[in-house]
Amino acid sequence: MEEKRNGLRVILFPLPLQGCINPMLQLANILHVRGFSITVIHTRFNAPKASSHPLFTFLQIPDGLSETEIQDGVMSLLAQINLNAESPFRDCLRKVLLESKESERVTCLIDDCGWLFTQSVSESLKLPRLVLCTFKATFFNAYPSLPLIRTKGYLPVSESEAEDSVPEFPPLQKRDLSKVFGEFGEKLDPFLHAVVETTIRSSGLIYMSCEELEKDSLTLSNEIFKVPVFAIGPFHSYFSASSSSLFTQDETCILWLDDQEDKSVIYVSLGSVVNITETEFLEIACGLSNSKQPFLWVVRPGSVLGAKWIEPLSEGLVSSLEEKGKIVKWAPQQEVLAHRATGGFLTHNGWNSTLESICEGVPMICLPGGWDQMLNSRFVSDIWKIGIHLEGRIEKKEIEKAVRVLMEESEGNKIRERMKVLKDEVEKSVKQGGSSFQSIETLANHILLL
C-alpha cells in the first residue's frame, strides 16, 4: 500500500495558534514519511517557518486581521479569522486543485476543528476533509453537551458544592466550570454547534492522543461524531524536537540545565496564550524563590498584564531569583522536558504540554488557565495521579509547598513512580505494533482510499 501513496498530495490548514500549528506540522511529518506529498495553506498571521520544513509546499493566504483584532482574546480572534479567511482559502484551494497534476492527485484536506467554513468549501470542491482535534478526546466529546451544562444551574458555584463532580463531565469539578466557559457565556454555543456539525460531515477525526490514555473516550468519539476516529498521538514522539515555534527560543537555558543536578529543576511555563496579573506573577516569583529549588521559568513577553516582561520584579527579588534560577522569554520545551536535570513541570496543562510531560516522565504541578486545561489538569491530579493541583490558588505559600512536595517529599516519589508507569505505556503506543502506530497505518490507508 505504501508505494501507492507516492503521487498523492495532502493539503493541511492549521489554525494560526502555537498550540495548533505544531501538531499540524508534526502530522505533516508523519504523513510525509509514509509517502504523501504535503502542501500547507496558512494565514499571514502567525505564519509557520517554511524554512524549517523544506520538503513541504507552503501557500500563504491573507487573513484581513488588524493589529487590534490580533490583540483580542482567542474567541474573538477565532470568530474574526473565520469570517476573513473563507474567501481567500476557497480561492487558494481551488487553484491548488486546478493546477494539480494527474501524476500527483490531491487526496484530501486536513484542517483544525476550529475552522468553521472548511467543510462547506471542501464539499463544494468535492474534496474529502479530515478534522484534526488538538484537544483531549474526552473534552471534544463534551462539545455537544457543553451548552446544556452551561445552562444547568451549576454556576455560580456555592462553596459547599465547589468540589462536587459535574455528573455530565467527570472528573471535572463544579468550581472548574467558570474557567471552562470563561467570559464567553452563550456566545460559545453557536461556535460549538458549528464544530460538531462540520465534524459529523467530515471523512474522519484525528486525535493527538492514544488508547493508553483514553480508550473509552475514543470509542465514544466514534459514536458521537459517526466518523472514523484515528488516535495517532503523541505526535512529537515520532521525531526529534522540531523548530515550529512562533517564538524565538532561548537556547542558553539548555546550557544552564547542563550545570544542574539530575531531576533537580522545576520547569515553569504557562504556555503561549495564558496571561496572569502582576500580583499573580509576583506570587509565583516569591513561591519559587522561597522553595530554594533550582528553576527554569518561561515568562512570555506580554503574558503579565500591564507589563512588557519582568519589570514588576524588584531588583532585590531578581537577585534572589537569579541565585537559584533562570528566567527566559521562551524555551525549547521538548528539549527542556527531556533534559536529565528537569524534575518537575509547573504547567497550564494545555494538551500539548501535558502530553510532552507524560512522554518525558516529568511530573506536574497544575495551574490551568481555562477551557480544556481544566479537564487535562483533573486527569493529571485526580485520575492518573501524576501531579499536584494548585486548585487555582496562585499564592506563594501554595506554590512553595507544591514544589517542595513534588521535588523533596515521599508523595513526590510516589507521583514520579506512577508517572514512569504511564510514560512506559504511552511509549509503547507509538512503537511498531502499538495502538498509535497501527492507527497511523489505518489513517494512511484511509486517505489512500478517499
UniProtKB/Swiss-Prot annotation:
It is an enzyme of class 2 (transferase). Pfam families: UDPGT (PF00201). UDP-alpha-D-glucose binds at residues 272, 331-333, 348-356, 370-373. Belongs to the UDP-glycosyltransferase family. The gene is UGT76C2. GO terms for molecular function: cytokinin 7-beta-glucosyltransferase activity; cytokinin 9-beta-glucosyltransferase activity. It comes from Arabidopsis thaliana. This is UDP-glycosyltransferase 76C2. Keywords: Glycosyltransferase, Transferase. One of its GO terms (biological process) is seed development. Involved in the N-glucosylation of cytokinins. Catalyzes the formation of both the 7-N and the 9-N-glucosides. Its EC number is 2.4.1.-. Inhibited by olomoucine and 3-isobutyl-1-methylxanthine. Optimum pH is 7.0.
